[in-house]
Amino acid sequence: MKASMLAKLDQLAERLDEVNALLAREDATANIDQYRKLSREHAELSPVAEQYSQYRQAQDDLATAQALLDDPEMKDFAADEIAAARDRLEALQASLQRLLLPKDPNDDRNLLLEIRAGTGGEESALFAADLLRMYTRYAERQRWQVEVMSESESDLGGYKEVIIRIAGDAAFSRLKFESGGHRVQRVPATEAQGRIHTSACTVAVMPEADEVGEVEINPADLRIDTFRASGAGGQHVNKTDSAVRLTHLPTGIVVECQDDRSQHRNKDKAMKVLAARIKDMQTRAAQAREASTRRNLIGSGDRSDRIRTYNFPQGRVTDHRINLTLYKIDMIMDGDMDELLSALSAEHQADQLAALGEDA
């Protein structure tokens, strides 16, 4: 293992000792926020320290076995012990490398998922509805909560745009690689002659701000408009000005919410979406600066990146970032996304490990 990595592990082991001492103090719970922060840090450091302790023990075992090689009676035993210790060291080194990978601070957050119809007109809007169902079904399989924050329906029951909030354990970490362009190839319901059409939607996955105050929004930078809600096809909606449109003047971000009959609740939803979009914009700007020196194999998550194709006649889903094709389109569209999402996470981890090797 490289000296830089060993030094990092020594620092983490020392920090765990410090955290243990702080948590053992009589007044540890006097500041509950600080106590929670220390508890989370303890939970993150403990597995690393435990693995590092095992690694050092394996090093000691190797040194002891090598010292026995000069004893003719112990030579065979020592050779077996050396082989076993080297195997343990190799496995522990790989495990420690994974534990040392930089953690995305947003991984444990809830998220906002936005789907927009793109090229393809009404068929694109219908595909947006299919994607919404796919993500909703996946969330249900994880026992996550799903809430519609904003929706704009098309005439045939699709969506020009829809935003949902997904709340659950490590939700963002599982779905964060879904941002980008999703292309569909199929015979549309509106096609009379059976020709295959290509349409597209864009998906944006944004970590939810822990609270709106986490993202600084100056009230003077907001323009708030209220108007009467309206639905597709002349559906009945309430007759008061309950719909809310927020315009963030510095960034030009516009958010509309009209799904609730309460103007106050619509404004609360709109503020959550606005905070997430501003945070997402800030995160992408930081990632763009980082990407100038290193390109992530999974891609930037930019909406202009075509990341996946859903080919219904062939029954396949292809993720272009990792060259993965799965012939189980019906299962995936029904929310069975684990194989796909796990492959993306594994590729991302491999990319991080390669970067760690370059930096070490």
Swiss-Prot record:
PTM entry text: Methylated by PrmC. Methylation increases the termination efficiency of RF1.
Family stated for the protein in its record: Belongs to the prokaryotic/mitochondrial release factor family.
Classification via PROSITE patterns: RF_PROK_I
Modification N5-methylglutamine occurs at: Q235
Presence of keyword Methyltransferase: no
Database matches in PANTHER family: LD18447P
Gene designation per UniProt: prfA
Localization terms from the record: Cytoplasm
Predominant place of localization: cytoplasm
Protein name per its UniProtKB record: Peptide chain release factor 1
GO molecular function, a single term: translation release factor activity, codon specific
Organism: Cupriavidus taiwanensis (strain DSM 17343 / BCRC 17206 / CCUG 44338 / CIP 107171 / LMG 19424 / R1)
UniProt keyword terms in alphabetical order: Cytoplasm, Methylation, Protein biosynthesis
